[in-house]
Amino acid sequence: MVCWLRSRWRPVADNDYRSAPGTEPFVPDFDTGAHSQRFLSLAGQQDRAGKSWPGSTPKPQEDPVGVAPSASVEVLGSEPAATLAHSVTVPGRYTYLKWWKFVLVVLGVWIGAGEVGLSLFYWWYHTLDKTAAVFVVLVYVVACTVGGLILALVPGRPLITALSLGVMSGPFASVAAAAPLYGYYYCERMSHCLVGVIPY
């Protein structure tokens, strides 16, 4: 109220739209005299109402001179009918892997993992300070797990997927290969063994 008393402008109420329309949508009135036309915001409104613009009366479509309707039908009928496109077989690669390839890939990885397991167990058994051997075993297990997960991320390559399964199961193959060596060392001191490697 203090600002209004000092100012010479009268404040406008919020609901007073006639004196201050603001950004309210409105239709402008183009009054050009006696023959003024009402402004249309959309050109399609007259078409919907069935009216037409002045001077835009559609002309009747005339047939070309010397051409009968039957002739035009014959021309259209003489064109060949559109044929459907046949499917084309594109050579691609298998999205699956044959079982013998899978077995070969996994066995190849397991043979390498078995050699690693035998070496690590032999080193752990004969060394006095077993800290380094245990640390290498931990690094080997982590490397197999991470490597298998990274290989499994390759899309659309079933051979790489089989390789990832072999790499992730590598530590189990290493344990299975080191188990007979452990049984052999155990049976050197114990007499109750089967085939010299299986204690009972």
UniProtKB/Swiss-Prot annotation:
Origin superkingdom: Bacteria
Signal peptide location: none
Positions of the UniProt region annotated as Disordered: 47-67
A single GO cellular-component term on record: plasma membrane
Transmembrane segments: 102-122, 134-154, 159-179
Keyword Cytoplasm among record annotations: no
UniProt KW keywords: Cell membrane, Membrane, Transmembrane, Transmembrane helix
Membrane-topology descriptor: Multi-pass membrane protein
Cellular location(s): Cell membrane
Protein name: Protein Rv0461
Source species: Mycobacterium tuberculosis (strain ATCC 25618 / H37Rv)
